[in-house]
Curated annotation (Swiss-Prot):
It is found in: Cytoplasm. NCBIfam families: glycerol3P_DH. This is Glycerol-3-phosphate dehydrogenase [NAD(+)], cytoplasmic. GO terms for molecular function: glycerol-3-phosphate dehydrogenase (NAD+) activity; NAD binding; protein homodimerization activity. GO terms for cellular component: cytosol. Homodimer. GO terms for biological process: cellular response to cAMP; cellular response to tumor necrosis factor; gluconeogenesis; glycerol-3-phosphate catabolic process; glycerol-3-phosphate shuttle; positive regulation of glycolytic process. The modification Phosphoserine is found at residue 154. It comes from Pongo abelii (Sumatran orangutan).
Amino acid sequence: MASKKVCIVGSGNWGSAIAKIVGGNAAQLAQFDPRVTMWVFEEDIGGKKLTEIINTQHENVKYLPGHKLPPNVVAVPDVVQAAADADILIFVVPHQFIGKICDQLKGHLKANATGISLIKGVDEGPNGLKLISEVIGEHLGIPMSVLMGANIASEVADEKFCETTIGCKDPAQGQLLKELMQTPNFRITVVQEVDTVEICGALKNVVAVGAGFCDGLGFGDNTKAAVIRLGLMEMIAFAKLFRSGPVSSATFLESCGVADLITTCYGGRNRKVAEAFARTGKSIEQLEKELLNGQKLQGPETARELHSILQHKGLVDKFPLFMAVYKVCYEGQPVGEFIRCLQNHPEHM
């Protein structure tokens, strides 16, 4: 069997952390081509191109400083060139940009290429919810899997132990992806319920914004635990409403579900920015620049898409926590009123 060529589409914080793992495994395992391409959105860093820095210093000095990438990971500034020969495409870019990237890649991929999305977000489709893996799969005509879990990028790059979940309908492909990405400290469970895995990954960012509001307003651990639990209830209810396939509670107990929700509500960037938003009154855009090096926040954007989907279906009242996050972020509702969505939650009625 010819060795599989791998391309990582994206090179931010999470993309670079995954490149470290994938590059290391591809160099050692016969089933993969050792040369891993990584598409890098070209930027100028102190008069040098970011791709040149990565290819000479083997470090993404902007998005994952202090971590060496394997020398077999090659940064490529042209996405079509990076992906042209790939058998496996790993998508890891902010979900706002995926449509444009797919437009560029369309018609330029290998006939039997497959993809895996690490992107946490949802899109609006004609029938309401559209998952990012569906957007990619339909645009490019390739089968898609997903990887979601309690994986804060800096900790993964530090090789601290964590778990993750791959959702893949084809068991053989799931096993291949596990071989490509598993390490002693990055442990993978493969499940077949792809949709539920991906919904968990998208919706937890909205809950984390609520958790950050909680922290910024000075509420305690009990309140935050309530945000996490009520958020999980809304995630499960949303999945059951919008997915045609099975939605089992067991999937919510995998790393992609409750574990990712907990870590994001305590350690993720959505929580951090939401806390600063509640404390300072600065805009989300301003805080992205100050706290995230200009990287985009997924939680508020996902809340906006959820609002549109739920409004279309007349179900806004059934998801008070999701909608409270939307109202604070986009409709100018005072953040101090966030607690009301908890006090009047239908779970207690």
